[in-house]
């Protein structure tokens, strides 16, 4: 906690349209040590940012450097694909006067130049890409449960081998429910982690068994691909 402002500022300076900062809880290996598991993980800051594909590498690198993500205890950073959406809405309302946009032009130049080295700033001779070892092809496993039960799901994820876990809270609108104030104000938790593709099914089954044993009848799982992630790897 305490570095979200620096990361968000770096995203803005890299051209990202409005990063969002949210708050929740998170934990990792230290939570598996019994003497340290007095309370749930400390409060965490989450910085979310949606950018065009052509800008993703540069923005990712600038955010990672600002947050010093590859240093011990500095958090976990990852990207997920967004297939449809609108960003910079004010600039996309009217039709473009050109036959192609920058998202099409930049990848085309990458192909022509045989890579991304041409993007190097000639004045500083530095590329926007970050020099580090990425974790690749992970899967994000997300579980939605009523907030009262999030601690059990949080523990189950860590107890079954996940390297870390994060939690966000919010109110979910259910179109099939009545309009009672109690249901409208009911808080839910989104508890999630990232693991290798071979571990997704076993982890989901283990957490499902825990949820069933608790008698929870309202919950949901979903997964998202994580093409790359960055954190401290030790050594």
Regions found by a protein language model. Give the residues of each.
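Positively charged, small/polar-rich N-terminal and surface patches that mediate targeting and assembly
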Residues: 1-235
């Amino acid at each position: 906690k305490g570095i979200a402002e620096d990361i968000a500022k770096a995203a803005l300076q890299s051209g990202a349209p409005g990063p969002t900062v949210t708050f929740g809880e998170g934990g990792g290996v230290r939570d598996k040590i019994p003497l340290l598991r007095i309370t749930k993980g400390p409060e965490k800051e989450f910085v979310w940012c949606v950018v065009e594909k052509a800008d993703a590498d540069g923005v990712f690198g600038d955010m990672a450097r600002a947050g010093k993500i590859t240093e011990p205890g500095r958090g976990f950073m990852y990207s997920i694909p967004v297939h449809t959406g609108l960003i910079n809405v004010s600039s996309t309302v009217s039709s473009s006067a050109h036959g192609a946009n920058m998202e099409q032009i930049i990848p085309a130049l990458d192909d022509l130049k045989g890579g991304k080295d041409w993007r190097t700033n000639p004045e500083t001779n530095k590329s926007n890409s970050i020099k580090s070892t990425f974790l690749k092809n992970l899967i994000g496993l997300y579980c939605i449960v009523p907030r009262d039960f999030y601690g059990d799901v949080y523990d189950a994820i860590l107890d079954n081998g996940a390297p870390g876990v994060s939690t966000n809270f919010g109110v979910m609108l259910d179109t099939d429910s009545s309009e009672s104030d109690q249901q409208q104000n009911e808080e839910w938790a989104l508890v999630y982690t990232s693991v290798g593709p071979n571990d997704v099914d076993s982890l989901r089954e283990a957490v499902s068994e825990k949820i069933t044993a608790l008698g929870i009848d309202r919950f949901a799982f979903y997964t998202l691909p994580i093409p790359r992630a960055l954190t401290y790897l030790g050594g």
